[in-house]
Swiss-Prot record:
Record-linked InterPro entries: Sugar_P_trans_dom, TPT_transporter
Modified residues (Phosphoserine): S333
Name of the protein: UDP-rhamnose/UDP-galactose transporter 4
MF term (GO), any: nucleotide-sugar transmembrane transporter activity
Keyword Membrane in record: yes
Family per similarity comment: Belongs to the TPT transporter family. TPT (TC 2.A.7.9) subfamily.
Residue segments, region Disordered: 307-337
Compositional bias segments (type: Polar residues): 319-330
Amino acid sequence: MFKKMSATTSKTDQKAALDIASWLFNVVTSVGIILVNKALMATYGFSFATTLTGLHFGTTTLLTTFLTWLGYIQPSQLPWPDLLKFVLFANFSIVGMNVSLMWNSVGFYQIAKLSMIPVSCLLEVMLDNVRYSRDTKLSILLVLAGVAVCTVTDVSVNLNGFLAAAIAVWSTALQQYYVHYLQRKYSLGSFNLLAHTAPVQAASLLLVGPFLDYWLTNQRVDAYNFSFVSLFFLILSCSIAVGTNLSQFICIGRFTAVSFQVLGHMKTILVLVLGFTFFGKEGLNLQVVLGMLIAILGMIWYGNASSKPGGKERRSLSIPITKSQKLSETNESDEKV
């Protein structure tokens, strides 16, 4: 009896340690790449967001190919229709985020990302028939209220930036839902899914990127005059992006898309503070800070409300469950937050 309890405690402690390590990995890489990209675009004028994203996935493809060659990534299957659908959502997500970062202040960029929580909840209601309690719904409304306060008062908001942020939010929510969906449906690990998606994303973004960037900025990427410092930041951005891509898949695989977004309030605070520290007080005023605090309080409230009995219930599943998956799902239930 004592040995069984000890083994259970040890397993719980190990899971908690892995969850914390995965989350810290995501926090460090996500905050780092936002700040590096902002410096590369704002300070050194490399405004080619789509091409930059293609280079990110090109670097990720090189790593996954190398790991596959070494045998660390095992062969797996992902049907082309599902792969192409995921890549479509993911490309719109990444391009939208990069363009939003270029056209908006760091503050509005990160605050807009907060709205991915209610969007992700809506997707779960529509696609997975999840039902939320009254407190959970009210917490989502509080998040929206905070975002609205920041949207109205942030002087750096413009129509193009707002539209880019809206596209980024919806496509990112769909992409994150699909990460969890595909990993579960096809029993794919984080590295396996990344090995399938990164080459297609790299090829499509590097093909479309230069033309889209020229349309957005009226500048040609091949005419950009690299300096030693800007080249260093470009290489640094590509290197960090590998960790960012991998950590996102790891975290969403261990948690869920909504929980992954709820935990994001720590990254929100870090990015806002570091953004205002390194890039000036652009768009910062009392109302923006108030809106930020309201939104973050709403996120914390959501985390508490949804974790209570009846706070978030799944009435049915959108993914067919086979007999072989039932056993694995029993084990996976211990891994989800």
